[in-house]
């Protein structure tokens, strides 16, 4: 069996194995939307090892920023897309790859299972009504499944409290392609909103984001940073990975400003200072 995975196989056998792996993924997880480039890219990364979060994330530097990549089907499917990413799909992709590498799993089917667990409530089958649309819900659900852990101490720098009050999706239905096409789903989305409304979480206000020993102890390289917002009806405005440079904390993210995945040249403090609607950060650790 070792000879069959040594990379010395004839091309036709490698192709046969790859097709079998893709078929297995579809059979196990129902409808999965992906290209051959995506599936082979996943397997290549899984086989290469090197499971540090930032090492995996940096493989995607330069990948184009594209929004709404999960809305490409009339009905919800598990979408795997390594060619185009928004801030959330970038984080989910990296996290699913990391979990597979940490477990020694090297198949596309294993990756699809990990991604589904991260993206949908309780790891449910792909269903728009079960997708973790709000990042507070995403963090709570993934913490409950042992995927990430909230970081909310010490105080300082976690000096502020966010009280969640979301309704943006149900009050802006026309902004969401699939929800607009399925108005009967609105009550289910409202239930998701109600699950987190009223909850309180400690966070670091942007005034506390400084290049200090304390902050370096509280926020680690590869932590997931959720940038909070004061936009009515929303909890989170942007997400990415924490990266420490000599001059302070930076964000590795799929950027709509730069139109690609970048390691933001500005410090996070400078970045937040340019956006009045951004109030601070919450942190979770893979």
Where are these regions (language model features)?
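Bacterial N-terminal signal peptides that target proteins for export
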Residues: 2-17
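Boundary at the C-terminal end of the N-terminal hydrophobic targeting segment
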Residues: 28-32
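Acidic/His-rich structured neighborhood in mature extracellular/periplasmic domains
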Residues: 65-202, 244, 253-256
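Short alpha-helix capping/helix-loop boundary micro-motifs
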Residues: 204-215
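Short, well-ordered loop/turn sites that connect or cap secondary structure elements
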Residues: 218-219
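C-terminal soluble interaction/assembly domains
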Residues: 223-286
